[in-house]
């Protein structure tokens, strides 16, 4: 009887389909002057290595000011600051993304072969976005952004690109 139960358990486990494998590919990060915690944006790939059409990009915290663990963005962070809107590019070549707190700058998430990258115009040139840095202080009605820095690499030359944006 025990042997029959053991085989039943093994066969039951083998008959359950495995969850689809989801891989991620780092796109860019947002660092802030407030603390060492970093928001990561990753491309989410299906088992065959293509951008996941259901959820092509994910965002989450890496809590470096604490113990380095990963945490999800909370509702307010998603709706007011670090969340994003994403939709398929009309050309069919990737996705168009805007970070909620800065919708003026559109980011294109594009896949070429195995590589996935976030493309953005930095200082007038198309570039691969690597990092944003936000210098801000706490104000009475929320954060007061002093400036934003964009860091990346020129798409054509591979040289480093930088732009400092001071809100008006």
Locate the predicted segments by residue.
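Beta-sandwich interaction modules
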Residues: 126-139
């Amino acid at each position: 009887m025990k042997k029959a139960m053991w085989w039943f358990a093994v066969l039951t486990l083998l008959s359950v389909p495995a969850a689809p494998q989801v891989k991620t590919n780092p796109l860019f990060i947002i660092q802030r002057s407030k603390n060492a915690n970093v928001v990561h944006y990753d491309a989410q790939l299906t088992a065959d290595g293509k951008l996941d059409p259901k959820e092509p990009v994910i965002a989450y915290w890496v809590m470096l000011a604490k113990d380095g663990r990963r945490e999800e963005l909370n509702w307010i962070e998603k709706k007011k600051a670090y969340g994003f809107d994403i939709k398929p590019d009309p050309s069919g070549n990737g996705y168009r993304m805007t970070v909620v707190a800065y919708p003026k700058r559109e980011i294109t998430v594009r896949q070429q072969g195995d590589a996935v990258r976030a493309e953005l115009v930095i200082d007038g040139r198309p570039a691969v976005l690597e990092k944003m840095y936000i210098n801000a202080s706490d104000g009475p009605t929320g954060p007061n952004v002093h400036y934003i820095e964009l860091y990346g690499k020129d798409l054509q030359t591979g040289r480093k690109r930088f732009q400092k944006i001071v809100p008006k």
